[in-house]
Amino acid sequence: MPYIPHTPDDVRAMLDAIGADSIEDLFDEIPSHLKAAGKLDALPEGLSEMDVTRLMSDRAAQDAGAVSFIGAGAYQHHVPAAVWEIATRGEFYTAYTPYQAEASQGTLQVIYEFQTLMTRLTGMDVSNASVYDGASGLAEAVLMSLRANRKSKSRKVLVPTAVNPRYTSATQAIVENQDVALERVGFDAASGQTPLDALKPYEGEDYAALVISQPNFFGSLEEVDALTDWAHANKMLVIGVVNPTSLALLTPPGEWGADGADIVVGEGQPLGVPLSSGGPYFGFMCCKQKHVRQMPGRIIGRTVDMEGKQGFTLTLQAREQHIRRSKATSNICTNQGLAMTAATIYTSLLGPDGLGNVAAHCHANTQALADKLTAIDGVERAFTAPTFHEVVLTLPKPADQVLAALAEKDVLGGVSLAGDYDMNNAILVNATEVHSEQDLQLFEQALKEVLA
């Protein structure tokens, strides 16, 4: 049955009201050669719900099963069943911060708890209610740094090439029409880190901020203390891009160097959000208290009403688009509420010890995988720097060729670095707590056969 509720008389009345002769007139700006003539005959006839279910089940059964060692910004973690059982309850199941928000005290408290968790995890003073994802979060941080750094009049930001290329390209797309320049800083070919030597040409120059990724795209751990102190000595703010899982083991960005990072962003997907064809994910964003009025996104505050009862409210709303219009800190006027709720539940269920165990298993499995693979002739670690849960390996054959052969053996063996870094024989591999010893052995055996 059709699901269009308008009768021919309804359609005629609406067309008369807007002065159009036909529905086709509404689309006259589309060139005729781009319009489909007549019906779309290739479309099959409609099916019943039962038949659609059967059809989609049959198609899903055709999917090939494979063990994945792909990371590069989106990571496979175990998500306890309780996380989404709670997150999808009717009380929580919403996509974003509700309008008339103070009427939804439960939702606001969840966001407030999320903000508290993120500040504790990052060691920062303030968190917002989340942004769209980690990549756009970096763009927001870059724009925020221009407003927040009162010691600089620059519209330029230093971005190491070891930052996730997807983050950099997304940031470039967002800021390039706002008169912002991203100056690229190279990495050390031996360590895979951003060395202080690479920053020497920028000493004394006017830049708004330096971006530091920890770990960086190669999985290498940066010398964050030295980089942070260098940036501050040169009157730049520090934007930290971090993996939240790693913060259970690594020094939080709020404690980098003598004064800590100024702004921190990252992808929240590892905190209880399953992999799903690129989303929906969520980004987190934290900063020092003194920069809070330059932070984009919604912020939930806790207060007390006239009767002395605790209450939660949207605070500092004058920063936001619905009030400041074009002068707002960002055009983000909502948040990724559902994914953020799942992350709050996930982090609360695991607690500090549980999150630490996840991080420790990720690190241990990655080191074990690297040891197994580098025992194969011709396979070596590309860099000397310590890593968290990703590592770059060089191969005796082209990476794309090897990865294609591994896929035929039901092993998704990582990400080729040939396109982004012109490292034709290098792959970025990842292991997390979900990978068993059997999975690691499967990868090892498959790679041996491919390279034989």
From Swiss-Prot:
Keyword presence, Glycosyltransferase: no
Keyword Oxidoreductase part of the UniProt annotation: yes
Reactions mediated catalytically: N(6)-[(R)-lipoyl]-L-lysyl-[glycine-cleavage complex H protein] + glycine + H(+) = N(6)-[(R)-S(8)-aminomethyldihydrolipoyl]-L-lysyl-[glycine-cleavage complex H protein] + CO2
EC numbers on record: 1.4.4.2
Record-level Gene Ontology MF annotations: glycine dehydrogenase (decarboxylating) activity
Enzyme kind, highest EC tier: oxidoreductase
UniProt-recorded name of the protein: Probable glycine dehydrogenase (decarboxylating) subunit 1
Species of origin: Alcanivorax borkumensis (strain ATCC 700651 / DSM 11573 / NCIMB 13689 / SK2)
Gene that specifies this protein: gcvPA
